[in-house]
C-alpha cells in the first residue's frame, strides 16, 4: 500500500525546513524512510514477493544517495536527521 496523503503531509510538516517545503533532502529522506519501513514489514510477511523486494532496494539506494549528498554539503543537518529518524546507531 502506498503512503496516504495524510501520513505524507504529517511527515512533511515534521521535517520541512520552511512553509511549503516538500523537496528538501530532509523531507525526501523522511518519506523514503517511512516507505522503506512499511515495505520491510511487507517483505517479512511475504518472503517470495521479489518485485516488492526490488522496489525496496531501489528506495534504499535512493535514500543512501540523498544521505550521502546531505553529508557532503551539511554535516550538522545530516547528523540531526539520522538521529531524529533513528538511522544508524
Swiss-Prot record:
Keywords: Ribonucleoprotein, Ribosomal protein, RNA-binding, rRNA-binding. Belongs to the universal ribosomal protein uS15 family. GO terms for molecular function: rRNA binding; structural constituent of ribosome. Part of the 30S ribosomal subunit. Forms a bridge to the 50S subunit in the 70S ribosome, contacting the 23S rRNA. Pfam families: Ribosomal_S15. It comes from the Bacteria. One of the primary rRNA binding proteins, it binds directly to 16S rRNA where it helps nucleate assembly of the platform of the 30S subunit by binding and bridging several RNA helices of the 16S rRNA. HAMAP family: Ribosomal_uS15_B (MF_01343_B). InterPro entries: Ribosomal_uS15, Ribosomal_uS15_bac-type, uS15_NS1_RNA-bd_sf. SUPFAM superfamilies: S15/NS1 RNA-binding domain. GO terms for cellular component: cytosolic small ribosomal subunit. This is Small ribosomal subunit protein uS15. GO terms for biological process: translation.
